[in-house]
A protein has these predicted regions:
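Short beta-strand/loop segment that forms part of the nucleotide-sugar
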Residues: 6, 30-39, 56
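Short, well-formed alpha-helical segments that are part of the catalytic scaffolds
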Residues: 10-25
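Acidic helix N-cap motif at the loop->helix transition within catalytic regions
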Residues: 13-17, 42-50, 90
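Conserved donor nucleotide-binding strand/loop of the catalytic core
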Residues: 31, 45-72
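A conserved acidic beta->alpha catalytic loop
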Residues: 37-45, 85
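Short aromatic/hydrophobic "clamp" motif used to bind/position activated sugar donors
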Residues: 78
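Conserved donor NDP-sugar-binding/catalytic core segment of glycosyltransferases
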Residues: 90-117
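Hydrophobic helical membrane-anchoring modules
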Residues: 167-222
Length: 222
């Protein structure tokens, strides 16, 4: 079984699109879906109630939420899915065969906004992932559960938990980068400005690698 773990907070506008097409996999017992809510004040939980197998409520924080979800997961594969990213049934099923060869990996991405700037951005993200062998949460990171437990899950960071766990996993094996694309939302770039958001991300990465405390980085990110 594959356990899909989704950390959320106020995602009522995206949940149905992300989860409705996966219901057949639940019916066939191919996957379970665990939603971990970090304090939503909208209709997130109400909408999710018929789309997931488990709803957990805890404090906000993506690393913490994902670890809480993983703690009750039954699957051999843990797949961490952001609420604004769409993955197909076929992509999920394909993991059953490759997980025996690679203990972790992620997908390539495209954006739901098809403007040329987003095509270029997606290309650069995918190229970076190939060169440096790490993915971000939007790329749907998946991990063999035994390995996840061995490394004690996501590190307790407020932000950059995806980058950190990839650096830990690379010490065990190189990732399997799937040659197929998940679709992720461009909403942050659209809301805060395309170039401004890219600059902000670069600044965050720079100070993260300098060792700045994740709580300070998270405040800047928000």
């Amino acid at each position: 079984m594959i356990s899909i773990i989704m950390p959320v907070k106020n995602e009522s506008l995206t949940l149905f699109k992300s989860l409705n097409h996966l219901q057949r996999l639940r019916d066939l017992n191919i996957c379970e879906i665990i939603l971990v809510d970090g304090g939503s004040t909208d209709n997130t939980i109400k909408i999710a109630s018929n789309l997931v197998d488990h709803i957990l409520i805890t404090k906000s924080g993506r690393a913490h939420q994902q670890n809480i979800g993983a703690s009750i997961a039954k699957g051999d594969i843990l797949l961490f899915l952001h609420a604004d990213t769409v993955i197909t049934k076929e992509q999920i099923v394909s993991l059953k065969s490759i997980i025996e060869k690679n203990v972790w990996g992620f997908f390539k991405i495209i954006f739901d906004n098809r403007k040329i700037r987003y095509k270029i951005l997606a290309y650069l993200i995918n190229f970076r992932s190939k060169v440096y062998n790490y993915g971000t949460g939007d790329q749907v990171i998946y991990i063999n559960r035994k390995i996840f437990n061995k490394i004690r899950g996501f590190p307790p960071l407020e932000i950059m938990e995806d980058i950190k766990i990839c650096s830990i996993l690379k010490q065990i094996s190189q990732p399997s980068i799937r040659d197929s694309y998940v679709i992720t939302s461009a909403r942050r770039w659209e809301k805060y400005g395309f170039f401004k958001t890219i600059l902000k991300m670069r600044i965050l990465r720079f100070f993260y690698h300098l060792g700045v405390e994740s709580k300070k980085l998270a405040r800047y990110y928000e």
